[in-house]
Amino acid sequence: GATMSFVLYLLGLADKVVGTALWIGPVLAGYEQANSRVERLADNDPSFEAVVGKRPDLVTTQFQWQIGPEGVVGTPAQFAELGIPVYTSPADCVGKDNSGGGDGVRKTGFTMDLIYQEIRDLAQIFNVQDRGEEVVNDLKKREDAARAKIASANGKLSAVFWFSSAELDIDPYVAGRNGAPGYIMSALGLKNVIESDEEWPTVGWETIAKTNPSVIVAGKMDRRRFPADDIAVKQKFLATDPVASIMPAVKEGHVFETVSYTH
C-alpha cells in the first residue's frame, strides 16, 4: 500500500521498492521523484501474479483484507509457498478483529505506537535502525506541536469524518471511534460523534444529523472507486441533500477537507 511505501521512502529505502499499490491520496511531498521510479502495480488491488511477478524478497501489506487469511490479493501461505515472507502493518492486526471481512473491528483504540512499531520493524528488517529512530522522533515532535496548537479545544467541539460513499443515496462510510481518524480527533480535542468500534461503519445522514457535529471533515483523495471519492461530489451533496444541507455545520461553513491516505 501507499502508506507502507511512504514508510520505506522515509527510511531511505526507495531503491528497495520494486512495486506499489493501493493509492488513495497523492505522493508524500518531497518523495515524488523517488516514487516515480517505482512501478505502480494497481491503484487499488493488484493481482497475486502482478505482485509475485516483481520477484520480491518481502511483501509488505497495510491490510489483511488484501493479504490475509481471506485476502483478495492472496494469503500469506500462498506467498510462503514461493519463499516470500509477508509483513503486515501492526495498525491492521494488533488489537483488531478482521475475521468478519471488510475493514474490521477494533478491540482497542489505534495509537501512534502502532506506526512507530511498523517503522522500527521495517528499519530492523533492512538494518537501518538509526534512521528508523530519527523518523519516529520527528513524528513525535510533529504530533506534540499539533496538540499544542489546539490545546484549548478540550472536547468542546465534535466532528464526523466522512471518508466516502459507495453510492450517494446510501449511508456514507464514516470514521469509527477506535481507528486512526478517531485517534486524531481525540488528540486534537474533538469528540467523534460516531461511537462504533468498526473501522469505517456506514451511518445514515439522519443519524449523523441528530448528533449535530460541530465540524464535518470530508476526505479528499485521488482515488475514483466510488462517486463520493471526488471532493466536489461531496461538496455538492452536502449543499443539496435534504438532510445534510440543513445541518448547522454545513449551513455555517464548518466543512473542512483533508487529504485521505490509507492508515
Residue ranges of model-derived segments:
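Acidic/His-rich segments in extracytoplasmic proteins that coordinate ligands and/or metal ions
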Residues: 22-125, 206-246
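Extracytoplasmic strand-loop-helix segments at the start of, or within, the mature domains
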Residues: 1-25
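Conserved small/polar residues in nucleotide/adenosyl-binding loops
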Residues: 262-263
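His/Asp/Glu-enriched short active-site or ligand-binding loop at hydrolase and phosphoryl-transfer sites
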Residues: 21, 26, 88, 175-200
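A short helix->loop->beta-strand "cap" motif at the edges of active sites that frequently abuts
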Residues: 15, 81-85, 251-253
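A local structural motif
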Residues: 30-39, 131-132, 187-197
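Basic- and aromatic-lined ligand-binding clefts that recognize polyanionic substrates
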Residues: 2-9, 131-188
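Structural recognition of the beta-strand scaffold that forms the well-ordered cores
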Residues: 1, 18-20, 59-62, 86-89, ...
